[in-house]
Every structure is written in structure tokens, then in C-alpha cells.
Amino acid sequence: MIKLRDELGTATTDSAQKILLLGSGELGKEIAIEAQRLGVEVVAVDRYANAPAMQVAHRSYVGNMMDKDFLWSVVEREKPDAIIPEIEAINLDALFEFEKDGYFVVPNARATWIAMHRERLRETLVKEAKVPTSRYMYATTLDELYEACEKIGYPCHTKAIMSSSGKGSYFVKGPEDIPKAWEEAKTKARGSAEKIIVEEHIDFDVEVTELAVRHFDENGEIVTTFPKPVGHYQIDGDYHASWQPAEISEKAEREVYRIAKRITDVLGGLGIFGVEMFVKGDKVWANEVSPRPHDTGMVTLASHPPGFSEFALHLRAVLGLPIPGEWVDGYRLFPMLIPAATHVIKAKVSGYSPRFRGLVKALSVPNATVRLFGKPEAYVGRRLGIALAWDKDVEVAKRKAEMVAHMIELRTRSSDWHDQNYEKRKHLLR
């Protein structure tokens, strides 16, 4: 692992520090931009050409990241200082091999291996971190799934052991939903579909992400710094809107920090962790963990001071650079600049060369802006951008972000224009 760093070189020279992004979506793009600001050389990898991060990288490679030989060919050629996974669809054996060969995998190969597999993650949360979670059981047959759902109780959630963004998951309201849940898990799983996890439904007040970052302090000691919890809601298992700070009690906020600290201490390494939790009153349950910047954390592009978004914090940690913070009641906290919110801009249709309109109206709204990711292809439900808004009142920011997002229309080469108003579930402005 790298140590506290006081020097940086210059990109494309023999003094350069170099990062290799495995995954080049919108989150990787922001990491790449922050790296460019510090003169760090950026190499981006993804399964398709001209992915967002590739557009701001020094070099890029296109290939199957589940192919270990392909990954090794890139790593041996580039010899990066840090290998930064941005997605889950990566050959895990390769990550362990890179580490064994002396490369720095962020935060470490084991954390990535645990986080992408729900059984490994749940057992780590409960048995190693010893944090509260919803009740859960596993099923490997349809009969076992019926039995597990009965024991957990209705409603409950079924999820493929390996999946993301809501794929392979089902909200089971009663026994009549179980065949559909079984089919969803079996057909939408990533990798093995042998086992399904059944989780108790928590009737939470708000779902939050704690963007805990493990990094070196100015004395060279690894510490964990906690930004304010980010509130968010999902539609069909995928992030749709987020805001910071989440509206939770002071007691719940301290519990969020406590749980995130226990989890990240167990996972180890350096970098930011998106720790997802449910909050109801003063009670908090751990849910999932992403050992990388989190999509809900894009709100920090507005809510944090310039140069300190979740992407900048991640990069600082990865490079061995310090992050400022203030100790309050035993936790090292990162100060927020202003309450802010995001709302997604999604495609309703599929096709190439997306175009956007409504920008004159959207970009005329005070204290708001739009980020378009530059993805060359749209498909139904794909996130192509976000609206960002900020205000001293987080509720105002939430409504403004939603309003601005819904001002944007988009089309592709093969489709007509469509707006964002086809989706109204959970929205504030109906």
C-alpha cells in the first residue's frame, strides 16, 4: 500500500503518477477529471469505446473486463500506481493476482470480492463488523424460497446473490409473487444464480449513503472521515434522486457513523466507501456497501466545497494525500458547504447519438445546473445525466433538482423527442 505522499509528478512524463480505471462511466469520468487537476496520468478501460471517462483520459482500452488475460495485458503495459475498479463486472481473480504481484488495488481486492457478493457481504456485516441488518435467509430451490419467505414474513425482498442496480431483485408481497421473484433472480443475476437471499422488509423513513473515506492524515496515520449522510430514493432498485444532508436525528447520524466505521475497518484499504443504510427514527440498519464512489454521492459535486467532491476525496485517499476534517464526539467529520440535491435524467427509448434539448430553460434556473455524461448510446432506463441544485433549505434543493431534470427532453437517431415526465413515482412535483 502507498504511504502519505508529499510529492506528485507530471502526467505523460517519467515522473507521473498513473491510475488505471476499470470501468469508465460517469463516476469514473469525475475521478479522471479530478486526477487531471492534479497532473495525474489517467488510463480508462471499459467494454465499449468512448465511454465517459475515456473522453477525459490520456489513454483508453476497450475489452471484456471479465477476461483475466485482457486485464493483465493492460496492467503489464501501463504499470499503474493504482488500479481503481469503478464497476462490479470485473474478473476478481485478476484483482487478487495484481495485488499479489505488488500492484495497489483500490481499496483492496478482498473488499471488492466481499462487496459484490450478497452472501459474503451479509456474513461480513453480521459476523465480522457486528452491525445490525435486516433479518435474512438463503434459498437454493423454489421450495426453499417459499419456506424462507414464510419465515421472514411478508412483504420481503428477494435478491440474486450477485447483481446490481435492482437487477435480479423482487419485492414479494405474498406467496403469489414467489414464482416471479424466482424467475427474476435466476434470469437477471450476474455470475452465479445458484442462491437467492431473502431479506426482511424494513419500513424505513429514509435510505442513506454514508460516504466514509479511509485515508492518511497529516501524520501518516490511516483515519476515517465522514461527510454528512446522503439521503436518496430508488425506483426499481436504481438510484433516482439524492440529497445532502439526509433528514435524520442526531442520534441516528451518530449511529450511521458508528456502523460505517465498523464496516470500513473490517474491509480496510484506502478510498471512499458508499455504505447504504436504512434509517427509521433513531434506528439504523446496514444494507449494502460499494467500495468506490457511489452514484448517490454525485450530490457532493454541489454540496461539498470545490475540490472536495466524493471523487476528489477518493482520489486524495488513493494517492496518499491528506483530507481535512474536524473531530466531533469521537468521529472525524468533513464539513458540507451547502445543502444540495440531484435528480436523474434517464432515457425512455433506445438508440445511438443521444441529443438533449430544454437546456435554455433548465440552465436559466438559479442555483442549479445539469451534468450530461456523454454516453454514446441510450437504452430504456439508462442514466444519461443529472440535474444538480443547491439551497440553504434541502427541501427547496430537492424540488429544484427534480424540476430542472424534468425540463430536459432527449432523442436518439432512431427515436422522437421525449421528456422525463413518464416517471412520477416518489416524486415531489407531480
UniProtKB/Swiss-Prot annotation:
TM stretches of this protein: none
Keywords carried by this UniProt record: ATP-binding, Ligase, Magnesium, Metal-binding, Nucleotide-binding, Purine biosynthesis
Annotated catalysed reactions: N(1)-(5-phospho-beta-D-ribosyl)glycinamide + formate + ATP = N(2)-formyl-N(1)-(5-phospho-beta-D-ribosyl)glycinamide + ADP + phosphate + H(+)
Biological function: Involved in the de novo purine biosynthesis. Catalyzes the transfer of formate to 5-phospho-ribosyl-glycinamide (GAR), producing 5-phospho-ribosyl-N-formylglycinamide (FGAR). Formate is provided by PurU via hydrolysis of 10-formyl-tetrahydrofolate.
Residues holding Mg(2+): 276, 288
PROSITE patterns noted in UniProt: ATP_GRASP
Top-rank EC class of the record's enzyme: ligase
Cited InterPro entries: ATP-grasp (IPR011761), ATP-grasp_carboxylate-amine (IPR003135), ATP_grasp_subdomain_1 (IPR013815), PreATP-grasp_dom_sf (IPR016185), PurT (IPR005862), PurT/PurK_preATP-grasp (IPR054350), PurT_C (IPR048740), Rudment_hybrid_motif (IPR011054)
Amino acids binding ATP: 118, 159, 199-202, 207
Annotated protein name in UniProt: Formate-dependent phosphoribosylglycinamide formyltransferase
A biological process from GO: 'de novo' IMP biosynthetic process
Gene3D superfamilies in UniProt: 3.40.50.20, ATP-grasp fold, A domain (3.30.1490.20), ATP-grasp fold, B domain (3.30.470.20)
Subunit structure: Homodimer.
Domain ATP-grasp: 123-319
UniProt-recorded Gene Ontology molecular function terms: ATP binding; magnesium ion binding; phosphoribosylglycinamide formyltransferase 2 activity; phosphoribosylglycinamide formyltransferase activity
Family: Belongs to the PurK/PurT family.
Domain of life where this protein originates: Archaea
Sites where the protein binds N(1)-(5-phospho-beta-D-ribosyl)glycinamide: 26-27, 86, 295, 375, 382-383
Enzyme Commission number(s) from the entry: 6.3.1.21
Associated pathway: Purine metabolism; IMP biosynthesis via de novo pathway; N(2)-formyl-N(1)-(5-phospho-D-ribosyl)glycinamide from N(1)-(5-phospho-D-ribosyl)glycinamide (formate route): step 1/1
HAMAP family in UniProt: PurT (MF_01643)
An example Gene Ontology CC term for this record: cytosol
Listed Pfam families: ATP-grasp, PurT_C, RS_preATP-grasp-like
